[in-house]
From Swiss-Prot:
It is found in: Cytoplasm. Coiled coil: none annotated. The lineage of its organism: Bacteria, Bacillati, Bacillota, Bacilli, Bacillales. Its main location: cytoplasm. Belongs to the HSP33 family. It comes from Brevibacillus brevis (strain 47 / JCM 6285 / NBRC 100599). This is 33 kDa chaperonin.
Length: 290
């Protein structure tokens, strides 16, 4: 089973919901950036939520997320679009702590609690939408729950988890869900959701046991109606062609100076950790086309 997410409604349309399996995408991120366990959990949770937020968009809309809590992990950056494509990285991927008192990876210690969650949405308008909310726990899921309420005025519940193999650092399971109450939701529906959430196992455990996003929503919603199914992939917008265009945009004089002084160029994409190297011969070929 590959990565995918679903969009659904429940409780007679009073709740909209998103659920995702992101195991392969988070593992791809971990491998590309050589992340240590706690960093993987923090960035993987953020990537999972960002992908589900992408499912709230349409067409060519996209969003950018930044989590900056003042912890040793530094910033977590993530991007996603409406088509299930997302990517994420952290400032310092080599962060790992012992398990916390709940027996879980100590994500809060890595992220920190002195900072904000920032969300920027490109909705095709003149100016992008920008929202933010203080970090309340550093556990990511709780922080985005608070963000939705404070910045987007949408009562929400966010559950997210990443299970990492302690021996080889590989990602065993990753996924999450977002529940959002629509206006005028009856109190009995709110009470029913709260009760079900209180009985729900950890998301990473459910994914690890083979539960699908549909089965996870079955546990928290009353006969959910599936509206869409979108495949997910860890996908970056960088490419060799874009790098060449960036080099061309330097102008002929600056390119000649680069060849003369350095004789080579390397461009590093922070999101996917890809490196594009151009030796003197390659740069001279680009110069000929300018």
């Amino acid at each position: 089973m590959g990565d995918y997410m679903i969009r659904a409604t429940g409780f007679n349309g009073h709740v909209r919901a998103f659920a995702a399996r992101t195991t392969e995408s988070v593992e791809d991120m971990r491998r590309r950036h050589d992340m240590w366990n706690t960093a993987t959990a923090a960035a993987g949770r953020t990537l999972t939520i960002t992908l589900m937020m992408g499912a709230m968009l349409k067409g060519n809309e996209s969003l950018h997320v930044k989590v900056k809590g003042g912890g040793p992990i530094g910033q977590i950056m993530a991007e996603a679009n409406a088509h299930g494509e997302g990517i994420a990285y952290v400032s310092n991927p080599h962060v790992h702590f012992e398990l916390n008192d709940k027996g879980k990876l100590d994500v809060a210690r890595a992220v920190g609690t002195d900072g904000f969650v920032y969300v920027t949405k490109d909705l095709g308008l003149k100016e992008p939408y920008q929202g933010s909310a203080p970090i309340v726990s550093g556990e990511i899921g709780e922080d985005f729950t608070y963000y939705f309420v404070m910045s987007e005025q949408t009562p929400s519940a966010v559950g997210v988890g990443v299970l990492v193999n302690p021996e080889d650092r590989s990602v065993l399971a990753a996924g999450g869900f977002i529940l959002q109450l629509l206006p005028n939701t009856p109190e009995e529906v709110v009470a029913a959701i709260e009760e079900r959430l209180g009985q729900l196992p950890q998301v990473s455990r459910m994914i690890g046991e083979g539960l699908t996003p549909e089965e996870i929503l079955d546990r928290v919603l009353d006969e959910p109606k599936i509206l869409s199914h979108t495949e997910i992939q860890f996908s970056c917008k960088c490419s060799a062609d874009k790098v060449v265009q960036a080099l061309i945009s330097m102008g002929r004089e600056e390119m000649e100076g680069l060849i003369e002084e350095q004789g080579e160029a390397e461009v590093h994409c922070h999101f996917c950790n890809e490196r594009y190297h151009y030796d003197r011969s390659a740069l001279e070929d680009i110069l000929k086309d300018m």
